[in-house]
From Swiss-Prot:
The lineage of its organism: Bacteria, Pseudomonadati, Pseudomonadota, Alphaproteobacteria, Rickettsiales. Disulfide bonds: none annotated. NCBIfam families: PRK00405.1 (NF001616), rpoB (TIGR02013). Belongs to the RNA polymerase beta chain family. One of its GO terms (cellular component) is DNA-directed RNA polymerase complex. PANTHER family: DNA-DIRECTED RNA POLYMERASE I SUBUNIT 2. GO terms for molecular function: DNA binding; DNA-directed RNA polymerase activity; ribonucleoside binding. PROSITE patterns: RNA_POL_BETA. This is DNA-directed RNA polymerase subunit beta. It comes from Neorickettsia sennetsu. The RNAP catalytic core consists of 2 alpha, 1 beta, 1 beta' and 1 omega subunit. When a sigma factor is associated with the core the holoenzyme is formed, which can initiate transcription. GO terms for biological process: DNA-templated transcription. It catalyses: RNA(n) + a ribonucleoside 5'-triphosphate = RNA(n+1) + diphosphate. SUPFAM superfamilies: beta and beta-prime subunits of DNA dependent RNA-polymerase.
Length: 1357
């Protein structure tokens, strides 16, 4: 049974997906292809073939493949290079001759004949590879490509938000492609319809329609509402009654039912839409039409007599005379169009034009300043919207257009069609008539996610297009008789474009690697910023706000607190992104009122019409919904519906939150703002050297630990054959399929944020493991569960003012036991260059440096691993040649002795900067190719090769032992067919006899079934050679040289581990947004203690709870207190040997956890007791989000632990020993240490001066300071601190003479010294003299009087 099992208060019905699947799947589709359309092969196929433009040659794409990376992931980090693989493509150059082949319609040759074909595999560049954890390693640094939320391609309808003078909204439509020109339609205040291309000058829509080839008759058919009037036998005209046409109309004639002759409404009545629909429902289908109404209407079709004669052409406006002649004309029907409401037709009437005029006008708008022709205008118009090379809607854009307008075009059609434009114009006209609704741009059905694969597709396409232009240029000057494809390719272009994206794009970000949670959150982040996205300065409230479609897709809690709030979000834990880029969330099918286990994913568009109930709906044992009426969501509104109409159910109550928010127990009891802070602060928690999983968790801790990639997980089931501090070897037990998996543990590896990545083995040799079992814990992980902090005994108590305003009081026990001690790795780099005066040199012999600063260096001048270093110590000794100086007598002597000039060098060593001290844990030496390796580099290389050999030997030993055990089974019990002492021919082979023979000679024994033994031996040899080959390749990589920058000979990297203990000024927090700074570390004997003498670990201010409204921390404290004391109770019973009580207590604790009870019932008493030993530190519980324990369950556990159900305890003051006046809330709470450490912030500059008259700026990193300025002087004046003020202005400023005097006084032990004149005062004096003002010091009273008289005279008094 697993050692770590939480007490659950709910059931997990749907397992969690891979939490970084979004990144992995997107990149896999780019590299390997898929149904997304973004793949390397698709891009090659879209750009190639490339023709030279003269029909002489064509370069075609055949296929491509990705090679293997040169180094593994960690090797690239060590060397500071990109983790990438070479891309090679097979290109075919087809050269055409002068003659042609093939025949046209008249027997004339049409196609050029192929003269020559040359194929070649060409290196196209290096493509960055995604690591197994979903990151990229660029120049040795792990980076994450954040997914981007942007507006989906397709059509959008909106209004201008500002009403016109008439009070009417003007509506707009916009067709946005993924790539290509935008097409906008808009109304002006006079209801004239215009269009724009790429937001340029607008034109009436008539020009677009004419350019699309529409005549007036076509426009009538497409956009106008035609009323067909028929002549009855009694000579009256009837028209079809359409309720929408009569909306808001005041009748100009009596409304009479043409079928019954009944008067429905009298003339002058106004018809509302409701009344019109009621009349239609009562049977009104046709009504009589007054001839007077036909006046000012237009003919939608030619008015043709019954004999076929055209009496009036279409488009004719009916006048009073025309209407009067209707009854005399030989017609039985007429199609009419009313100008009111037919905005397209009215625009055509106002701004009519011909086809040629339309084309030329559009050309002038798109390309102003050029002289157009009709042919060039036609080509331009065709390329704007109907050419796949310049216009692309993607499959998602086509699907959205099809869904919006009920079209049936194929997904592969990714350009606009005429029908798309017609439907857009018709829909916009309906909106202007206030029929229909505008689109909500914040609806997730209108926004899609672009992931890393799509970004790579765009960059790759840009690179290939640039390469194609270069190919065309090279073809122009190429000799096609001899040229090969590789001579026309510049492979640097593609790599440069991709490199530019990873290095400069706002969406390629330095990975947040503080802890495993911060990593996984960064990979699941979705940003609305970046290229093609929003600008945080202009983004309004609506786009930042929570939307109803975010339910189950985007977390409503987790987002940054600053200027990007609402623009950067996180995926909900169950959400995934489909092939079109839309976010989907899972639901369980509900059939006939029964909630099934069948799960489907729905996008925001799919679930609009669905009836979806909550995961907490009450069901019976068979899954049938109990209640007759169920609270559901339909069209994003909450309604009660019958259970038979329910279609889907949420899979879990926690599906609406992100990974970080799902780790907060009792999240439902916290204010949203504090939950946001809690989510963000968990990502800032520093991994501790002794991590501890929370007693009160949510059940998500294990999933996050696995999904982060920080732990080592067994790939296959097997047996652990070998373990040490760095390696784990697992082998199979199968006789048919034998394999060996070797795992290497990370040791003291530096993260992006200088935290320590260190893995610890959690299995033992001989242990059987299943696929997916945890083999090694990583940073901030314990027993396979995320462990960001520690469980502490907390008291909510105001204590002597030390926890005022969120300050935190800590017991010295916490510091003494290193509960919150963390290790941080600082990396320092020393670069050895080849200068113009000669190469720099690594050496221990650095002149002018005291031996005490060189103590950690080895004989080669590089710090030893394991050395303790302090600020100012030399990590790498290095000297640099200096320029020549005048020859001294000593130098003359050296030249005379050695016959050459002695090298003049200066110290350029790498020193440990101020404020840093620790232990050297690793040294890396990288050397340029072609340079002989120095001693330390050879030593490091030998250590690495020895480590690889040790791993190889372990694998070979496991393989050998396994194979010989199988061979032994085959031989024992069989009759020998040959003699091999001590076994004779005909003897029965026994184990004892085999033990006397060397194992290598067992293969020589001949028995029946020798073919199977030969097969076993062949398998053994093949596997043996495979292992050796793998490690030989590793040896070559280790021995290989490094590619360094130009002029760099060597790079030495030294990593120093710095231990940070908890101290006042460090920032701590809980998981509920409750943060504070440590104000004091109190001796354990002075801290408040419980009745049994147990001192509390931490004291928090109770006033921090009610105003912040994060009551979840109180519930966590109570439940943690119960869990902690249950562990103490179990421990006491175990120590007493009362095992029956232990079993009863364990069964009572888990009685409401059905899965755990089922497992406990299968265990024996001894196994239950053994399991209970793992509960000594407390019973871990899972308070899932929205499904945690209720108050009565917490009280039950408190009573079971023997504690007051109120959760309060009697506390005694540790200083006085007196009992506090009332009971205090005491419990066990999970606390985190955040990376805002006081050691990284507090900085004191107590040495040295600065440049005269300038400020000592530069900050902590340069050991700088800040000026004691004017306002600071005022403060000292206000306090009357005259001597301190004088010191600040003189010897502590820029009084050079005074500083020398102070130094002399300190050396003599004298307290008296004299101040000098500050240099800044001398500067002021010289500036006054430059203004012809002479300033002198005077001490004589007479001189003062003289100066006073002069001043009075100058003022005229």
């Amino acid at each position: 049974m697993s050692e770590f099992h939480r007490l659950y208060f709910d059931e997990l019905l749907f397992d969690f997906p891979d939490l970084v699947k979004v990144q992995k799947d997107s990149y896999a589709s780019f590299v390997g292809g898929g149904d997304t359309g973004f793949s390397i092969s698709d891009i090659f196929a879209s750009v190639f073939p490339v023709n030279d433009g003269y029909g002489r040659a064509s370069l075609e794409f055949v296929s491509c493949r990705m090679g293997e990376p040169k180094h593994d992931e960690y090797g690239c980090v060590e060397r500071g290079i990109t983790y990438s693989a070479p891309l090679r493509a097979i290109l075919r150059l087809v050269v055409f001759g002068d003659e042609t082949s093939g025949e046209g319609s008249e027997g004339v040759s049409t196609e050029p004949a192929v003269k020559d074909v040359r194929e070649q595999e060409i290196y196209m560049g290096d493509i960055p590879i995604m690591s197994k954890n979903g990151t990229f390693i660029i120049n040795g640094v792990e980076r994450v490509v954040v997914s981007q939320m942007h507006r989906a391609p397709g059509v959008f309808f909106d209004n201008d938000k500002a009403r016109s003078i008439s009070g009417k909204l003007n509506y707009i439509a916009r067709i946005i492609p993924y790539r290509g020109s935008w097409l906008d339609f808009e109304f002006d205040a006079k209801d004239v319809l215009y269009f724009r291309i790429d937001k340029k000058r607008k034109l009436p829509v008539t020009f677009l329609l004419r350019a699309l080839g529409l005549s007036n008759k076509d426009i009538f058919a497409q956009f106008c509402e035609v009323s067909e009037c028929r002549l009855t036998k009694d000579g009256k005209w009837t028209v079809c009654f359409v309720p929408e046409k009569f909306k808001g109309v005041r009748l100009q004639y009596d409304l009479i039912n043409a079928e019954t002759g009944e008067l429905v409404l009298a003339k002058g009545n106004r018809i509302s839409i409701v009344l019109a629909r009621n009349l239609y429902a009562k049977g009104l289908r046709y009504c009589y039409m007054d001839l007077e109404v036909m006046k000012d209407m237009y003919l939608a079709d030619d008015l043709v007599s019954t004999k076929g004669e055209v009496l009036l052409p279409h488009g004719t406006k009916l006048t009073k005379e025309h209407v009067a002649k209707l009854e005399f004309l030989d017609v039985d029907s007429i199609k009419l169009v009313e100008l009111k409401g037919n905005y397209v037709f009215s625009t055509v009437l106002q701004y009519d034009c011909s086809y040629e005029e339309a084309m030329l006008s559009i050309y002038r708008v798109v390309r102003p300043g050029e002289i157009p022709s009709v042919e060039s205008a036609e080509k331009l118009f065709e390329s704007l919207f109907f050419s796949p090379e310049r216009y692309d809607l993607l499959n998602v854009g086509r699907i959205r257009l099809n869904a919006k307008f009920n079209l049936s075009h194929d997904e592969s059609l990714t350009v606009l069609t005429k029908e798309d434009i017609f439907c857009t114009v018709k829909e916009l006209a309906l909106l202007q008539r206030e029929v229909g609704d505008v689109d909500d741009i914040d609806h997730l059905g209108n926004r899609r996610v672009r992931s890393v694969g799509e970004f790579m597709d765009n960059q790759f396409r840009i690179g290939l297009v640039r390469m194609a232009k270069v190919i065309v240029e090279n073809m122009a000057t190429a000799d096609f008789d001899t040229v090969m494809p590789c001579e026309m390719i510049n492979s640097k272009i593609l790599g440069a474009v991709i490199r530019e994206f990873f290095m400069s794009s706002a969406l390629s970000q330095f990975m947040d690697q503080t802890n495993p949670l911060s990593e996984i959150t960064h990979k699941r982040r979705i940003s609305a910023l970046g290229p093609g996205g929003l600008n945080r300065g202009r983004a309004g409230f609506e786009v930042r706000d929570v939307h109803t479609t975010h339910y189950g897709r985007i977390c409503a809690t987790e987002t940054p607190e600053g200027a990007t709030i609402g623009l950067i979000n996180s995926l909900a834990i169950y959400a995934k992104i489909n092939k079109y880029g839309f976010i989907e969330t899972p639901y369980r099918y509900v059939r006939d009122g029964r909630v099934t286990d069948e799960v489907t994913y729905l996008s925001a568009i799919d679930e609009i019409k669905a009836n979806i109930c909550q995961a907490s709906v009450r069901v019976d044992e068979e899954g049938y919904i109990v209640d007759d009426l169920v609270y559901c969501r339909r069209n994003y509104e909450n309604v009660f519906i019958p259970r038979s109409e329910v279609q889907f159910a949420d899979v879990s109550a926690k599906q609406i939150v992100s990974v970080a928010a799902s780790l907060i127990p009792f999240l439902e009891n916290d204010d949203a703002n504090r939950a946001l802070m809690g989510s963000n602060m968990q990502r800032q928690a520093v991994p501790l050297i002794m991590p501890e999983a929370p007693l009160v968790g949510t059940g998500m801790e294990g999933y996050v630990a696995r999904g982060s990639g920080a732990v080592i997980v067994a790939k296959r089931a097997g047996v652990v054959q070998y373990i040490d501090a760095r390696n784990i070897v697992v082998a199979s037990e199968s006789k048919d399929d034998f394999w060996i998996d070797s795992y290497t543990l990370c040791k003291f590896r530096k993260s992006n944020h200088n935290t320590c990545i260190h893995q610890r083995c959690v299995v033992h040799q001989g242990q059987r493991v299943k696929k997916g079992d945890i083999l090694a814990d990583g940073p901030a992980i314990q027993k396979g569960e995320l462990a960001l902090g520690r469980n502490l005994v907390v008291a909510f108590l105001s204590w002597r003012g030390y926890n005022f305003e969120d300050s935190v009081v800590i017991s010295s026990n916490v510091v003494r036991d290193d509960l919150f001690t963390s290790v941080h790795l600082e990396g320092f780099e020393c670069v050895v260059r080849d200068t113009r005066l000669g190469p720099e040199e690594i050496t221990r012999d650095v002149s002018g440096v005291a031996e005490e600063f060189l103590h950690c260096l080895d004989e080669f001048g590089i710090a030893c691993v394991g050395a303790n270093v302090e600020a100012g110590d030399v990590l790498v000794g290095k000297v640099t040649p200096k320029s020549s100086s005048p020859v001294t007598p000593e130098e003359k002597l050296l030249r005379a002795i050695f016959g050459e000039k002695a090298i003049d060098v200066k110290d350029s060593s790498l020193y440990l900067p101020p404020g840093v001290s620790g232990c050297v844990v690793d040294v890396k030496v990288l050397q340029r190719r072609g340079i002989e390796k120095v001693g330390r580099a050879l030593l490091i290389e030998k250590q690495a090769i020895d480590a690889e050999k040790t791993r190889r030997d372990h694998e070979l030993a496991v393989l050998t032992n396994y194979i010989y055990s199988l061979l032994k089974e085959m031989l024992v019990g069989k009759v020998a067919l040959s003699t091999l002492a001590p076994i004779s021919k005909g003897d029965l082979i026994t184990e004892e006899a085999l033990e006397k023979i060397d194992r290598e000679n067992w293969w020589k024994i001949s028995v029946d079934g020798i073919s199977s033994i030969k097969l076993l031996r062949q398998r053994f040899v093949d596997r043996f050679d495979e292992i050796n080959k793998t490690y030989e390749e590793n040896f070559e990589k280790i021995r290989g040289d490094d590619d360094l920058a130009q002029g760099v000979l060597m790079v030495v990297k030294v990593f120093v581990a710095v231990k940070h203990t908890l101290q006042p000024g460090d920032k701590m927090s809980g998981r509920h947004g409750n943060k504070g700074v440590i104000s004091r570390i109190v001796p354990a004997e002075d801290t408040p203690y419980l009745a049994d003498g147990t001192p509390v670990d931490i004291i928090l201010n109770p006033l921090g709870v009610p105003s912040r409204m994060n009551v979840g921390q109180i519930l966590e404290t109570h439940l943690g207190w119960a869990a902690y004391n249950l562990g103490k109770k179990i421990s006491k019973l175990l120590d007493e040997g009362n095992y029956s009580e232990v079993k009863s207590l364990v069964l009572e604790i888990y009685k409401n956890d059905r899965k755990m009870m089922a497992r406990l019932n299968e265990m024996t008493d001894a196994e239950i007791v053994e399991y209970s030993r793992s509960l000594r530190g407390g019973v871990p519980v899972a308070a899932s989000v929205f499904e945690g324990p209720k108050t009565d369950e917490i009280e039950r556990l408190l009573v079971l632990a023997g504690k007051d159900p109120s959760g309060q305890e009697v506390l005694y003051d540790g200083v006085t020993g007196e009992k506090f006046d009332r009971k205090v809330t005491v419990g066990c709470k999970y606390m985190l240490k955040l990376h805002h450490l006081v050691n990284d912030k507090i900085h004191a500059r107590s040495i040295g001066s600065t440049v005269d008259t300038q400020q000592p700026l530069g900050g902590k990193s340069h050991f700088g300071g800040q000026r004691f300025g004017e306002m600071e002087c005022w403060a000292l004046q206000a306090y009357g601190a005259t001597f301190a003020l004088q010191e600040m202005l003189t010897i502590k400023s820029d009084d050079v003479v005074g500083r020398v005097n102070v130094y002399d006084s300190i050396v003599r032990g004298d307290n008296d010294f004299y101040y000098g004149v500050p240099e800044s005062f001398n500067v002021m004096m010289n500036e006054l003299r430059a203004l012809c003002l002479n300033v002198e010091f005077c001490s004589d009273l007479e001189k003062k009087k003289d100066f006073g008289d002069l001043a009075l005279a100058a003022s005229g008094q």
